[in-house]
């Protein structure tokens, strides 16, 4: 049985303190400071090259960085098992020979011993997760046989079996069908209801109000952070996007 609900009374919080990242001497993220309290679905919004994906990678230690991040008061790099991460699809090899159920089962490995075989109860969790995302009949297929939206749902199912307290998603809705997007958002909303804290790098401004409780507006620096209602404003968006906002048709 999948475990989703966090401990009652516990406050889940990400603290980002002076986080900076440079690539080949070029500053990509400049002293980001923000505290995100869960449960929530928070959108990370900004123009191309604003440092959105870099922020996630810096938090996870995937790229070299300055500053620090805390998870519930502890160094985030010591709490990685509590975080599920789905990177951009462009970085994933669709042709890798692995079945859907095996791909989902990878979410279980942070919690099992090296070379330990999965138990029947573990495969039950995999099947339950696939059912939640509407892919229970696809378990034996190769991932190369899936559409982009179906594969993204597989990655969400992998997050489900990981049973993490925090979920970081980098552009999960790019290039997927509307049915898959709806299923993923329904799943994420249930996870938030169950106490999870979710960060999503996102670019489609038309969906921001419908999808996010909070938004972090970013353009190499934190421009604004807060509830979507109070933060996703014309003034803040112009400050974040500048002329790009009008080139893209407005917010």
Curated annotation (Swiss-Prot):
Presence of keyword tRNA-binding: no
Checking InterPro entries in the record gives: AAA+_ATPase (IPR003593), ABC_transporter-like_ATP-bd (IPR003439), ABC_transporter-like_CS (IPR017871), Metal_Ion_Import_ABC (IPR050153), P-loop_NTPase (IPR027417)
Task: Point out the coiled-coil segments of this chain.
Answer: none
Task: Could you list this entry's UniProt keywords, alphabetically sorted.
Answer: ATP-binding, Cell membrane, Manganese, Membrane, Nucleotide-binding, Translocase, Transport
- Which Pfam families is this protein grouped with? ABC_tran
Q: Please give the chief subcellular localization of this protein.
A: membrane
Q: GO cellular component annotations, sorted alphabetically?
A: plasma membrane
* Entry's EC annotation: 7.2.2.5
State the membrane topology: Peripheral membrane protein
Note the superkingdom of the native organism: Bacteria
Looking up PROSITE patterns in the UniProt record yields: ABC_TRANSPORTER_1, ABC_TRANSPORTER_2
| Catalysed reaction, written as an equation | Mn(2+)(out) + ATP + H2O = Mn(2+)(in) + ADP + phosphate + H(+)
According to its UniProt entry, what is the function of this protein? Part of the high-affinity ABC transporter complex ScaABC involved in manganese import. Probably responsible for energy coupling to the transport system. Essential for growth under Mn(2+)-limiting conditions.
Query: How is the quaternary structure described?
Result: The complex is composed of two ATP-binding proteins (ScaC), two transmembrane proteins (ScaB) and a solute-binding protein (ScaA).
The family classification in the record reads: Belongs to the ABC transporter superfamily.
Q: What protein am I looking at? A: Manganese import ATP-binding protein ScaC
Species name: Streptococcus gordonii
Q: What gene is this protein a product of?
A: scaC
